[in-house]
Each structure stands twice: as structure tokens, then as C-alpha cells.
Amino acid sequence: MNKSKVFRKSVMIIAAFIVMTFFGLVPGGENQNSGDENSNIENFKIVKPLPEMVYFGVGEKLVFAIQYGLIYAGDATMEIRNIAMLDSVKTYHVVSLARTNRAFDLIYKVRDHHESFIDYNNLYSIRFEKHLREGGFRRDETVTFDQKNHLAVYEDKKVGIPPMTQDFLSALYYVRTVELNTGEAVYLANHSGGKNYPIYVKVLRHETVEVPAGEFDCIVIEPVLKTSSIFKHEGKLTIWLTDDNVKMPVLLRSKVVVGSFEARLKEYTLSSAEPRVPQISREARNVR
């Protein structure tokens, strides 16, 4: 493969990282070495905690710079825009945008848009939308989660889902509401692309990191899919959340074959909403 093809492939992988890794969950595979002693999932206690307290709310906005090594590749944002009612269900409306910068636009332009509507009390997904604009590729898809009847409803099909199923965006918000203890792995049911993928969020350690937005004491987590077949490429995603009640993501790092990528928090606005105890349904309590 000549240098130009290698470069173009690398750019496409960067774009894919921005699209799929930014608050999606890159499959790490249970056999990969994370660099942490005893990091295999078998060494973690599997837990299924319910949400305890919600410290985020409308108005929270996180802005990340995406880097591939020393190369600035683009930006990604994640914002809780409003409270929305969907079929009488109160939800958080979360919008995530990812885009390559002008330099990368010349080679492979990305303007992707994901939306998640998260149940206000049970913190599971009610609807997930993705609107992909990647080079000449365009795709729009919406899935509605009928959590009562355990169905993911697409325009042309219905798929059975486990109770309390998450999409890739809602999964992160759920994790932010539960207690995270080192040595434990939080189990989440996840659905994407017409298939169900269990996720185990390993809680690795505590450490301090510095990003453009400042220095933060963090708890380090690593989400792992039970199967690695969801993506063609494999990489390990590590996420640094603030080690406080808010659990704000400040750094995401993914190692893949061609190098490593980082999403580093550069700006943030926290919500002025008061912390609250979510009113978990009886069904949700029974299944967790």
C-alpha cells in the first residue's frame, strides 16, 4: 500500500473514531491487555446498580478536541438540550455532534449528529437517532425503545431487547448516576444496529489528569463489549470521569492498530439543575 493510501486510510480511521468512539463504546475485547494488572473481566465483580442520584441536567454542555497523536482532527460536543415528552414519557434530550476540522474536510469530511432521549427517572433509552454525513456517505436511522414490551422499533422491523436497554449515549449518562468502585464492572444492556450487545464497564483506578479545561481528579473506567464483532476494527476505549458526584467525562483515549486517539475536554458548562433522586419504576428495580 502506497503512502497516500495509508494516509487516507488513517484519516478515515480518525473520522470513524470521531463518529463511533465519541461516547460510543469501542469494543475492547476481553482478551486485550489494558495495561492494568488483573484487568481481565474475570477479575472484576459484576454489579447491576440502579441510579442513585442525578447531578446532570438541562444546560450541561461538554466540548472536546479530538486528537490523533499530535494532530488535531476535529471537535465533538455533547449537550443536554431540553426536557422532551415522548408518548407521555419525560426524557432528557441529549445531542452529540462530531465534525472534522477544515484540514481533514479536504480529505474526508465528517458532520455527524446523534440524539438520545433518556427516560427522566429510569435513565434508559427511549429513542436514539443517528444522522451520518461522512464523505459521500449518508445515513439516517431512528430506533424507538419500547421498554415496557421489550422491543426496539425501527422503520422496517422490530427487535426484542433486554429490560433497561441503553443506546451508546444513554449508557454513559447511566454510568454517571451509579456508584463506581474499583474492582467492579457495571453491567449494562445495550442495543445498536438491530443487535443487542451487553456492556461491562470496568472501574480501574483513580488518578489525576490535565486537559485543556483544567486539572481533574478522576476515576478511570473501561467499557468492554461482550463480543467484539460490532466493529470491523478493534480498539480499547478508556474514559476518565471526574471523581465526584457529577462524574463528568474529561478524557477519552482509544488505542487502535495505527496509533491512539484522544478526546480532551476543552470547554464545559454544568447544569444549574438541582441534584435529584430518580424515581425508579418497580419493573426496573425488579430486573436490576
Task: Indicate where each model-derived feature is located.
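Helix-centric, low-specificity signal for extended rod-like, repetitive segments
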Residues: 1-2, 169
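Bacterial N-terminal signal peptides that target proteins for export
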Residues: 3-14
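General helical secondary-structure elements
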Residues: 4-5, 172, 281
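Alpha-helical interaction segments
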Residues: 12-13, 98, 163-164, 230
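Bacterial N-terminal signal peptides
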Residues: 13-22
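Acidic, serine/threonine-rich low-complexity disordered tracts
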Residues: 25, 33-145, 180-288
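Hydrophobic, well-structured mid-protein blocks that either form specific transmembrane helices
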Residues: 135-177
